[in-house]
Every structure is written in C-alpha cells, then in structure tokens.
Amino acid sequence: MAVKLKQKEVAAVREALWKQQKGACPISGRRLPPPSQCVLDHCHDTGLVRATLPRAINGVEGKIKNILTRWGQCSDPFEAIRILRGLADYWETHLKPQTEYIYPTHLTPAEKLAKRNAKVRAARAAKKGGSSG
C-alpha cells in the first residue's frame, strides 16, 4: 500500500531513489546531478512517486505528456506510449534519407551564409547611402 510522504521526507526519498538508481537518469541514461539538484518525479494523476530526475528531464517529460494529451489527443497512457515508440522509430528510420526531396524553404549551410552576407551587404549599402548627406 502506498504511503503519502510528508514534505520533510521528500529530500530523503529523493536521495534514496538517487542511490537506488545508481546516480543514473532512468529516462536519458545520463549521470544525475547531486540529489539536491534533482527533483522527485511523480505521476500527476495518481501522486505515486516514480524516480529521481534532473529538473530539465522532468520538465521535458511533463511537456511531452501535455503535448500528447492536448495536441496528440491521446486518451490513455498506452496510446501515448505507442505514439512515442512510433516517433522514435520514425526518427531512427529517417536518420538515413528515405526520399530524394528537400523541402522548399530549407536552406543549406551555404545558402544560409549567402543570405546572411547579402543582408549584411544591404545594411552596409543603406548605411553608406544614408550618411552621405
């Protein structure tokens, strides 16, 4: 049976979970910062504590859940999990190009540089033209 923590117990539980996790983030696999710089993640539906996470990863988790619920219209957690797995597979598949097409508004690094240089030249020309009076 789950036990509701008192606020004064949060730091001790956060540290205990940090040690249980061997100082590793269960989401990213990265090394966790010291327990005092982590947060005690919990499910906002049930209140159950899940793990000790870095603050940034905890924020990412919440934002992704919110996006999937609101924009992705996920009605239950299993649907959200299915979509996330599908998204990861999709990204992995497309690390190698699957088509020969480039989106019309995409700029290559050379095109970005040319655009920036043209903007700088235009600004210099405008400044020169405006200061000769």
Say what each PLM segment does.
Residues 9, 13-16, 41, 45, ...:
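Conserved aromatic-histidine-acidic binding/catalytic patches
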Residues 23-26, 127-133:
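Charged, low-complexity alpha-helical linker segments
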Residues 50, 69-81:
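Compact, Lys/Arg-rich rRNA/RNP-binding cores from ribosome-related proteins
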